[in-house]
């Protein structure tokens, strides 16, 4: 078996590479715009330093590939607002390049990393795949466009596709120093250094956190199960407040950190929760929980 991971030097992509590198031939295509080659240290993979917009490079990477995991993207919401045209070029045109070449080369399936951001700030929870998307940013719009392109290719018989809408993914190799870093790596970094942990607003915002290794397992499941086609939520279906997340991390780190409150951030969604029943009913079962994932992440630092 041969797999191609676009964006495979990134946080989630590198975990897919780690999952497959002993059981499959793994090709990673990444221009290291936000990915890091150190994420692939010790992994038996073929690395191609190139953009998904480079048709020749994508064609070379695609030779003999059975399954494509399309992780490459502009992943920062604020950056997408600052540079919407570049976001569209990378996230939509880049995906189209990969889809076309995957179809031409005879790849069996493409699994696309979509996002819960497509739901927007409509307050109804849990989020179900049948709900009308309401993207609020160029990033979210690009992910919805990507889903539509995947569906179009599948409906026309060019290549099977599955799109997984990631909720709040966390785990090892998530960068706490990024300008757009997620809560878990920031909280862990500060807790391990006994620094204050900042909560925006009252900290009662809730999220559906999902461990990266279950994200990888779900992507692998989607790739190899013929019946898994279309769009699926990927979360645990569990609500966790940002305040309780911080408390759990402080306790795990045996830290003296305390929480401080700042003003709410404009545009922040108050509550986000997946309905994962569609994916679960297809046969996927998580192997981790928020608690076990946090513990393993902490131990990796």
Predicted regions and their residues:
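N-terminal Rossmann-like NAD(P)+-binding domain of SDR-like oxidoreductases, especially those catalyzing
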Residues: 1-169, 213
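Short, solvent-exposed loop/helix junctions and linker helices
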Residues: 6, 89-92, 140, 177, ...
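Short glycine-rich loop/turn motifs that provide flexible caps or phosphate-binding loops at active sites
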Residues: 6-9, 34, 72, 93, ...
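Short, electropositive, low-hydrophobicity segments enriched in small/polar residues
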Residues: 11-17, 39, 54, 77, ...
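Short amphipathic alpha-helical interface segments enriched in basic and hydrophobic/aromatic residues
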Residues: 37, 70-73, 188, 192, ...
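Residues that form or immediately flank small-molecule/cofactor binding pockets and catalytic motifs
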Residues: 52, 132, 171, 204, ...
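NAD(P)-dependent short-chain dehydrogenase/reductase
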Residues: 124-125, 136, 148-208, 212-223, ...
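C-terminal substrate-binding subdomain of Rossmann-fold SDR/epimerase-dehydratase oxidoreductases
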Residues: 191-301
């Amino acid at each position: 078996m041969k797999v191609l991971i676009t964006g495979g030097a990134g946080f989630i992509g590198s975990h897919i590479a780690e999952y497959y590198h002993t059981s499959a031939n793994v090709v990673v295509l990444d221009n290291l715009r936000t990915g890091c080659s150190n994420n692939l240290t010790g992994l038996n993979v073929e690395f191609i330093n190139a953009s998904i917009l480079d048709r020749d490079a994508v064609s070379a990477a695609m030779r003999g590939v059975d399954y494509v995991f399309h992780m490459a993207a502009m992943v920062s919401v604020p950056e997408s607002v600052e540079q919407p045209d570049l976001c569209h070029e990378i996230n939509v045109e880049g995906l189209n390049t990969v889809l076309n070449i995957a179809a031409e080369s005879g790849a069996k399936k493409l699994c696309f990393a979509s996002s819960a951001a497509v739901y927007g700030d409509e307050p109804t929870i849990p989020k179900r795949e049948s709900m009308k998307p309401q993207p609020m940013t160029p990033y979210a719009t690009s992910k919805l466009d990507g889903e539509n392109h995947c569906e179009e290719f599948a409906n026309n018989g060019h290549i099977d596709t599955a799109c997984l809408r990631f909720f709040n993914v966390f785990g090892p190799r998530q960068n706490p120093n990024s300008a757009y870093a997620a809560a878990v790596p920031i909280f862990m970094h500060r807790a391990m250094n006994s620094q204050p942990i900042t909560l925006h607003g009252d900290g009662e915002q809730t999220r559906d956190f999902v461990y990266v290794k279950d994200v990888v397992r779900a992507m692998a499941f989607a790739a190899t199960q013929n019946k898994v086609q279309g769009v699926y939520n990927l979360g645990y279906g569990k609500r966790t407040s940002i305040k309780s997340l911080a408390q759990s991390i402080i306790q795990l780190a045996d830290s003296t950190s305390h929480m401080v409150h700042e003003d709410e951030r404009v545009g922040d969604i108050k509550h986000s929760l997946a309905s994962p029943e569609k994916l679960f009913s297809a046969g996927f079962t998580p192997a981790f929980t928020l608690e076990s994932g946090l513990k393993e992440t902490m131990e990796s630092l």
